[in-house]
Structures are given as C-alpha cells and as structure tokens.
Amino acid sequence: MTLTIYKGRPGNITERQEREVRVYDLLDSIGVDYDRLDHAPAMTMEVCDAVNAAFGRMTLEEFKAEDSNDRTKHAIICKNLFLCNRQKTKFYLLMIPGDKKFLTKNLSAQINSARLSFAGEEDMLNFLDVTPGSVSVLGLMNDHGHIVQLLIDSDVLQSEYVGCHPCINTSSLRMKTKDLMEKVIPALQHEPVIVNL
C-alpha cells in the first residue's frame, strides 16, 4: 500500500466530515504546520502499518536506541485511549505510543483513580465528537465543558514529531511535538498530566 504525504489541509474539503474540517481550521488558525495522509479506515493492522511506515515511525525500542541526531525524522504514532472511572464521573484521554503496553492498574495508581475502563461510544460522541477508531487529542476541541482530563505518557514527548487522527480515522496527521505542547494543547484549554507507564 503506497500512501502520499500532503502538506496541510486538503485542497477540496467538500467531501470531508465537519469534525475533520474543524481540526484543520483550528490547526491553521494557531499556525501549526502539519503533514497529512489520507488512507482507508485505520481499523486493520495493514492500514496502521502503512501509515506508520509512511510517517517513518519506529517501534519504541528502536526509537530509544536511535542516535538522538537521527530521531528528528521519526514520529511517535499514538494510540489514544478514552477512559473513565467505574462511576463514569471522570473521563480521561490517554496519549501513549502505539506499541507500548497499557495496564490500567499502573495508570490508576498514578492519577489516584479507582479502576479505569474504556468509555463507551456514546461518551466519545458526547465529549469528543469522535467514533471508535478515531479518538484523538484533537477531539478535545469539542470538550467545551472541560470534562475530559488529558494524560500524556512521557515517551510521547521524546520524539520531535507526533502522529494522530484529525477526529476521523481515514486521515492521519504528523506535527511537531513542540507545536502540540506549546500551541495545540493551550488552544484546546486542557492542561495535560504527564504520566510514566
């Protein structure tokens, strides 16, 4: 599967979903440069692997072993997990490297929360305006009540670039991690908590 990397938003947005266009509007309004890949829905490992290869993604182990001068060309493609406590009174969006193992008990201990589980599709739509497979840090732009707490695994911050969906799983974006932390997250008005998983 061959994918083409494009700079910025699509030239023609008439066929794009409104939630995706809002992401491009936000990124453009705050001066964030980003690369974009359009692809089949990222529901299979074949599609995810093709996106990862196009963006130059390495495994976490390869990334940590890489000479720091060579890291700049690689992006950490995140899996974004939408979590909640048992009572569904607290919601969390966790950004973690795609190949990093996630254990809920490790995270629960760090954020002083009771047992965590995955939030349902209805909560994804209500708080982030996304569907399963499309969860993204960029969905926080739709959390106007600031209900969702952003959690970022410290390994995400080690790469010069980070990859995520623009609230739809038929496109993927790559942007500088510095822009994510210094421009995007402040614009989303969701103060992150850094965790070590």
Residue ranges, per PLM feature:
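Extended, low-hydrophobicity, polar/charged segments
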Residues: 1-197
